Curated annotation (Swiss-Prot):
GO terms of biological process kind: amine metabolic process; cell adhesion; eating behavior; leukocyte migration involved in inflammatory response; positive regulation of acute inflammatory response; positive regulation of D-glucose transmembrane transport; positive regulation of leukocyte migration; regulation of blood pressure
Signal peptide: none
Family affiliation: Belongs to the copper/topaquinone oxidase family.
Note on cofactor: Binds 1 copper ion per subunit.
Keyword flag Calcium: yes
Binding-site residues for Ca(2+) 2, renumbered to this chain: 572, 641, 663, 667
Reactions this protein catalyses: methylamine + O2 + H2O = formaldehyde + H2O2 + NH4(+); benzylamine + O2 + H2O = benzaldehyde + H2O2 + NH4(+); 2-phenylethylamine + O2 + H2O = 2-phenylacetaldehyde + H2O2 + NH4(+)
Glycosylation sites: 137, 232, 294, 581, 592, 666
UniProt-recorded name of the protein: Amine oxidase [copper-containing] 3
Subcellular location: Cell membrane
Extracellular side: 28-763
Length: 763
């Protein structure tokens, strides 16, 4: 290579480097040399200010802190000086257990919503424990009007047909604390030798804790609870770490000093008392299995053992959110509804409208139960009715980016439970629009004509999560762009376990050296008050039949022809479908108004559930959740039948306060305001993969409400998200295909709020 050639190449290299530097500098702004900031996505639609929602949502809004405070002040003033803060109340005290919204009568709400009448009077429902009265009882009082209450009325007899016995009351936190004191300071020291030998027990230590079961006894009037004793492992779930000790505590007496241990169970054998257990241990008559103080083996912490990797996918709104939330109301271009949280029953939505037309008045969770089996007394007798504990009460803050999309809208919930002052649960709800990564509908044609048409499936979701002891329930209300509503729940959290001994594998799977994951079922019940094109609806059942016939064009041959069967369900008995029996695959509520094609406008109820067989009716506790007998039941809507369950059923399942079978009285359901009651559930046999805790995958059930001839055609046909192009069109042209414009419309960086968490104690 000549010197001249070398100089030319060197000059070209210098020019190239100079050009690259110029390009890089062109990408810098005049802010001291930093790269120019990318365009940030708008937080609201540029052409739309935050919407002011109609005050019509107010009838269903949960009580505000100011309203809760006003009610409590009124109760303290009018119930006398003997009222004790529930956080400190003993069974012999009078206290306010809870205050929440008293839902308005439907007729009054509709007069306001539909005919411009005055809004219903806002009232509160207060539950009072009168332990200090000569005949202790539970009373329910309606207090109003809010926000300045001037009256209260006792509705106990009106709502329940008589007084509520005191033993039916839910257990206060203070009562659990007194039981804790009794067990760990009065009773366990009687077996300190055995417990030190098996479980590293220290009298002043905190390495053991208790876990409640329910129901509490074997007959009405009992208040005797089996408590399991577990290792307390800091930063990890204690639920899979039983030591094999279970205690039956009788806590019926109003004086905690009179509470007693009725029975003791230890690693497969029953004893009359802890003293007897200790004496037999000292005599060498107890075969003790040593349980390490770091638990029963396995990986129990939810802290990952690997460092964080690359960030997972993130959804954002390139042109701002397409929905808004104000107070309790959500509104999008398609949907509008109010949402709330019952302190005991859980999530609920009201006045649900699609394209401005109401399709349902109320969709709400009613109850959730977990029924267990096992070979220890605690596991074999457990049936948690979560409404008694409080599905709303035990809702948790939603963790941004895990429980909900990072950029979801988060909403607080205010409540007054076991306290004289309101508290706030931060981030109790999240609302978000989600691209499902799935076409709602599509077709690609290569026959005769060449085109593609489709629309992406985006949904609007309202979510809350309740942690009831070991299990976390994720509750979703999902709104689709074709007018369908999806209601579902997923179970996650820790499994409940028992000490593994004997024939334990009849009742589950061994998941650690000394731990049996106990078999159980999850079931939830839902109220669905559909108003399909009006209040007067009819229930229809459709399915298929194979009908033999001669082939018309060749009669010597036969064929089986598929045809639709239709039946009008005229009574509540006809419309009650027991679990395990055949249920019509198409069941829908319809009006007497027709669509363009002459069919009754309807909404179909499609259930996705694996509930299996219900608890046999011979069980003495089965009457407490007779709704569990039915896959689906349709009844007349009645104000005096607001809920299929009761918080009092848990502690007196033998004489339940609410028996759902009373709702099915064979009245007509033709042309009436109807409610569909839906059961969804599944069987869970815990297995190794439930360690460290249960995943949501495959552990979700629920139902759809789907338009059935409600429209003249699929309403998503008018979705602005639709895509259509033909073979002869340029699919890269933004005028033809809006997805081709994403490089412009979605070329922005979302504003990510700082990570926050609602905390572990209520404010």
């Amino acid at each position: 290579m000549t010197q001249k050639t070398t100089l030319v190449l060197l000059a070209l290299a210098v020019i190239t480097i100079f050009a690259l530097v110029c390009v890089l500098l062109a990408g810098r702004s005049g802010d001291g040399g930093r790269l120019s900031q990318p365009l940030h996505c708008p937080s609201v639609l540029p052409s739309v200010q935050p919407q002011t929602h109609p005050g019509q949502s107010q009838p269903f809004a949960d009580l505000s802190p100011e309203e809760l405070t006003a009610v409590m002040s009124f109760l303290i003033k009018h119930l006398g000086p003997g009222l004790v803060d529930a956080a400190q109340a003993r069974p012999s005290d009078n206290c306010v257990f809870s205050v929440e919204l008293q839902l308005p009568a439907k007729a009054a709400a509709l007069a306001h919503l539909d005919r411009g009448g005055p809004p219903p009077v806002r009232e509160a429902l207060a539950i009072i424990f009168f332990g200090g009265q000569p005949k202790p009882n539970v009373s329910e009082l309606v207090v109003g009007p809010l926000p300045h209450p001037s009256y209260m009325r006792d509705v106990t007899v009106e709502r329940h047909g008589g007084p509520l016995p005191y033993y039916r009351r839910p257990v206060l936190t203070r009562e659990y604390q007194d039981i804790q004191e009794m067990i760990f300071h009065r009773e366990l020291p009687q077996a300190s030798g055995l417990l030190h030998h098996c479980c590293f027990y220290k009298r002043q230590g905190h390495n053991l804790l208790k876990m409640t079961t329910a129901p509490r006894g074997l007959q009405s009037g009992d208040r005797a609870t089996w408590f399991g004793i577990y290792y307390n492992l800091s930063g990890a779930g204690f639920y899979p770490h039983p030591i094999g000790l279970e205690l039956l505590v009788d806590h019926k007496a109003l004086d905690p000093a009179l509470w007693t241990i009725q029975k003791v169970f230890y690693q497969g054998r029953y004893y009359e008392s802890l003293t007897q257990l200790e004496d037999m241990f000292e005599a060498g008559l107890v075969n003790v299995v040593l349980v390490p103080d770091n638990g029963t083996g396995g990986s129990w912490s939810l802290k990952s053992s690997v460092p964080p990797g690359r960030a997972p996918p993130l959804q954002f709104h390139p042109e701002g959110p397409r929905f808004s939330v104000q107070g309790s109301q959500v509104r999008s271009s398609l949907w509008a509804f109010s949402f709330g949280l019952g302190a005991f029953s859980g999530p609920r939505i009201f006045d649900i409208r699609f394209q401005g037309e109401r399709v349902a008045y109320e969709i709400s969770v009613q109850e959730a139960i977990a029924l267990y089996g096992g070979n220890s007394p605690a596991s074999m007798s457990t049936c948690y009715m979560d409404g008694s504990f409080g599905i709303g009460k035990y809702s948790t803050p939603l963790t941004r980016g895990v429980d909900c999309p990072y950029l979801a809208t988060y909403v607080d919930w205010h409540f007054l439970l076991e306290s004289q002052t309101p508290k706030t649960l931060r981030d109790a709800f999240c609302v978000f629009e989600q691209n499902q990564g799935l076409p709602l509908r599509r077709h690609h044609s290569d026959f005769y004509s060449h085109y593609f048409g489709g629309v992406v499936e985006t949904v609007l979701v309202v979510r809350s999560v309740a942690t009831l002891l070991n299990y976390d329930y994720v509750w979703d209300m999902v709104f689709h762009s074709n007018g369908a509503i999806e209601v579902k729940f997923h179970a996650t959290g820790y499994i409940t376990s028992a000490f593994f001994f004997g024939a334990g594998e009849k009742f589950g799977n061994r998941v650690a050296e000394h731990t049996l994951g106990t078999v159980h079922t999850h079931n939830a019940h839902f109220k669905v008050d559909l108003d399909v094109a009006g209040l007067k609806n009819w229930a229809w059942a459709e399915d298929l039949a194979f009908v033999p016939m001669n082939v018309p064009w060749q009669p010597e041959f036969q064929m089986q022809r598929l045809q639709v069967t239709r039946k009008l369900l005229e009574t509540e008995e006809e419309a009650a479908f027991p679990l395990g029996n055949a249920t019509p695959r198409y069941l829908y509520l319809a009006s007497n108004h027709s669509n363009k094609w002459g069919h009754r406008r309807g909404y179909r109820i499609q259930i996705l559930s694996f509930a299996g067989k219900p608890l046999p009716q011979e069980s003495p506790i089965e009457k407490a959740f007779t709704w569990g007998r039915y896959h689906l039941a349709v009844t007349q809507r009645k104000e005096e039948e607001p809920s299929s369950s009761s918080i009092y059923n848990q502690n007196d399942p033998w004489t339940p306060t609410v028996d759902f079978t009373d709702f099915i009285s064979n009245e007509t359901i033709a042309g009436e305001d109807l409610v569909a009651w839906v059961t969804a559930g599944f069987l869970h046999i815990p297995h190794a993969e439930d360690i460290p805790n249960t995943v949501t995958v495959g552990n979700g059930v629920g139902f759809f409400l789907r338009p059935y001839n409600f429209f003249d055609e699929d309403p998503s046909f008018y979705s602005p998200d639709s895509i259509y192009f033909r073979k002869d069109q340029d699919v890269t042209d933004c005028e033809v295909n809006s997805l081709a414009c994403l490089s412009q419309t979605a070329n922005c960086v979302p504003d990510l709020p700082a990570f926050s968490h609602g905390g572990f104690t209520y404010k």
